[in-house]
Regions:
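Small-residue (G/A/S/T)-rich helix-start motifs and N-terminal tracts that mark the onset
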Residues: 4-149, 157-175, 179-246
Length: 246
């Protein structure tokens, strides 16, 4: 494995040499993350912060769509539309009253692709299941989508059987697999180093960003550059964490 703990240690190398040396690997720290958060203008409104679409949930898995929708709202999105099967509509409307609920034609699962032109980002996957109808709907949804995507959970499991679709995703798209979901797409790995290398190769070939989730999540760019997020903790090892991270 890659070890249990990542730390930056000063071993008295030349500071100038370190700053001039190129590396594809970097450890993110709190001050670097804080610098990425843009301050909000006093006179801003919800239209300034984008409209996202979330395609999530199936009958018996409404919780996945609720958790993902709540997390999306808390992340600061201006507007959120949730596309869900009819039988999940009531609980979604009650649990996430801020969201706009769009009904799928199916009572129980994602079966009908929806237009994405009016959105700035589209998330697909939490709790959608892997029925034949959902598989067909996902592939059709991806084939015509020009909006950046965040693909997770069952969306990735479906794509593992249709790897050609990974190379046609819109620019700026993000895949957020946990280790097993990644291995379904790239093949079994003997250790975490091999898994990281295969994730970097997938990011380059598919021209997508990949967040390989774990205690030290690896954020991989389409160029293959890798940033490690050290803020994970064992408290996240519980049902629903992945849906929130989407």
């Amino acid at each position: 494995g890659l070890g249990d703990v990542y730390k930056r240690q000063d071993i008295n190398l030349s500071r100038e040499a370190i700053e001039e040396t190129e590396s594809n690997y970097a450890l993110l720290e709190a001050e670097e993350i804080h610098a990425l958060i843009k301050p909000r203008n006093t006179f801003s409104h919800k239209g300034n912060f984008g409209h996202a679409l979330l395609i999530a949930g199936s009958y018996g898995m409404a919780g996945a769509s609720i958790l993902a929708a709540r997390a999306c709202m808390r992340s600061g999105v201006g507007l959120l539309t949730v596309h869900a099967p009819i039988r999940n509509n009531d609980i979604l409307q009650i649990s996430v009253p801020e969201a706009i609920i769009e009904s799928d034609a199916s009572d129980t699962y994602f079966a009908c692709p929806t237009d994405t032109d009016d959105y700035q980002a589209v998330g697909i996957g939490p709790g959608i299941g892997r029925s034949e109808e959902t598989e067909a709907a996902l592939l059709e949804q991806l084939s015509g989508c020009q909006t950046p995507l965040v693909l997770d959970a069952d969306a990735l499991n479906i794509l593992a059987n249709h790897r050609h679709a990974l190379t046609t995703l819109p620019k700026g798209s993000i895949l957020t697999p946990h280790p097993k979901e990644l291995e379904r797409m790239v093949g079994k790995c003997q250790n975490s180093y091999e898994r990281l290398m295969k994730a970097c190769e997938l990011a380059r070939t598919a021209k997508v960003h990949i967040i390989l989730k774990g205690a030290y999540s690896a954020i991989i760019t389409p160029s293959g550059k890798c940033y490690f997020n050290s803020t994970g903790n064992p408290g996240m090892a519980t049902a629903g964490s992945g849906d929130v991270l989407t």
